[in-house]
Amino acid sequence: GSRFSERVTGDRNRYVGKKTIIQLDIDPSEVDKNVMTALPLVGDMKENLTKLSERVQKLEIEHWWHTIRAWDATENRSAQSGDRLTAPWLMKELTRSFKGEDTVFVTDVGQNQMWAALHLEVDAPRHHLTSGGCGTMGFGVPAALGAKISRPEAQVVQICGDGGFKMTGMEMYTALRESAPFITVVINNSCLGMVRQWQQVFYDKRYSSTILTPFNFVGFAKACGADGATVTTCAEFTAALAKARKQGKNFLIEA
């Protein structure tokens, strides 16, 4: 089902290397389109995976998990950088603040989605809503609205970038109208971060249509009947999050 796009593989030559690639897809036109495979299996995923698993030996991967946990511990330490607000720290703070609670996290699309996937810890199934690799910028706000209407007893926290919020942010008014409050965290880097990153890595920093003009996110939220705060430090973020939880209404934090 993977298209082996550059957002999945990065540098395809380095990604492929000496690997033996088996591609499973329902669509034959996707086979060998981006990466040459040793064994293409076209058809129903469940049927093909069942047959494939019968021929694959079970691997002992405990040592690999130890390596991953060591990386995670290193990343956790690097995320602590005084009072300077970083995306990894922000995700860890959200995890800490809502630990053990019935909280549904919703991510938009872009670097915010990647940071959440790496550093946000979710305790239960169906408590992390994401559009995966579909690239649906603007998914966050309406998805959070739907989650809150579906499960009004749960706390809903929506994480997005400045680009994604600008696409569907007006739904905050719908949330007001429907009495469906949730917390929105906008990670604002004043650009379409993931596209800009690819322009930097693959296109010799030839930036095009990725730098965004300033926008008053908190003012916009207040115009939609919500409250909000702009934060630049860890302490400010923690205080704003506590205020958002106490108020129990739509609240936007621009970080």
Regions found by a protein language model. Give the residues of each.
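Glycine-rich, acidic loop regions that bind phosphate or pyrophosphate groups
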Residues: 1-67
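Generic enzyme active-site microenvironment
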Residues: 23, 106, 159-160
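Thiamine diphosphate
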Residues: 13-15, 31-42, 46-52, 114-255
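Active-site diphosphate/adenylate-binding microenvironment
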Residues: 68-153
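Active-site glycine- and acidic-residue-rich loops that bind
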Residues: 3-5, 84-88, 164-167
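Short, well-ordered loop/turn elements at secondary-structure boundaries
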Residues: 17-18, 99-101, 247-248
